[in-house]
Amino acid sequence: KYGTQEALIEAVADVDAMIIRSDKATKEVIDAAKNLKVIVRAGAGYDNIDLQACTDRGVVAMNTPGQNSNAVAELAFGMMVYMARNFYNGKSGHELKGRKIGVHAYGNVGQNVGRIAKGFGMEVYAFDPFMTDEQIKAAGAIPMHTAEEMYSACDYISLHIPATDKTKNSINYELLSRMPKGGVLVNTARKEVINEAELVKLMAERPDFKYIADIAPDNAAEFAQFEGRYFFTPKKMGAQTAEANIKPGSAGAKHIVAYLQDGWNRFQVNK
């Protein structure tokens, strides 16, 4: 990771290809890379790349989906157990076995969540508008046809939707208020998909509702009033394992070689 945008801009001046992890590939960075042909995000999310700037320059932008999916799924369950057992404070908690979990977006991470959930003896439901019922069933979950239907039925909701113009702030009061008593929202996606003000409103109204995430919200201090009902990791932690740090970078390098040699662009995310 470069310390400043200026350092990154200087570093990319003569490159033909870039792999980025947490740095931001802004328009300024992309325009500074005069020879740039392809940029790859080492991970599934790509909201730190200015896709329009890439398109304007004729640069192909790709991601590396699935490379850190197990790491994210394992962290989701680590946080779920931590919350279910009251932060290991010695007081009785509850078991996950027999509970219903709804997986919002059933891609690589979501399917790993489903796999682990079955090991805990949970009932696994999934909503994904880009998958058919048959695909969801084949991947081991019970398909739900709307988000509203799934949120109304499940004790746990695990979020895996990307942050797009359509999904930002989409996890709102109307949707979350449908969850049963004792509902737990698990966010290892992006904080931008949560309507934070409406989540705070719901938690203030419902002392049974809990929220856990691998990134702190913008206004973390507002959650102090909900002691014992929320948990955030100090930084974005889903992909922070040795394995997940190696695999996306390796996949990104392979993407670049394949694109430069053969024009391969299976995981292109810009138009």
Tell what function each PLM region has.
Residues A73-N89, K118-M122, S250-W264:
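Oxidoreductase and adenylate-handling cofactor-binding alpha/beta cores
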Residues M83-G119:
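Glycine-rich NAD(P)-binding loop of Rossmann-like domains
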Residues A61, L75, Y173, K181-K271:
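Rossmann-like dinucleotide-binding domain for NAD(H)/NADP(H)
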Residues D16-G93, N195:
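Phosphate/diphosphate ligand-binding glycine-rich loop within oxidoreductases
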Residues L36, K97-I101, Y173, G182:
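Phosphate-coordination loops involved in phosphoryl transfer and adenosine-cofactor binding
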Residues N48, Q111-N112, Y173:
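Residues forming the Rossmann-fold NAD(P)(H) cofactor-binding site
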Residues T26-D31, M131-Q225:
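Rossmann-like adenosine-cofactor binding region
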Residues Y2-G3, G119-A138:
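NAD(P)-binding Rossmann-fold cofactor-contacting core
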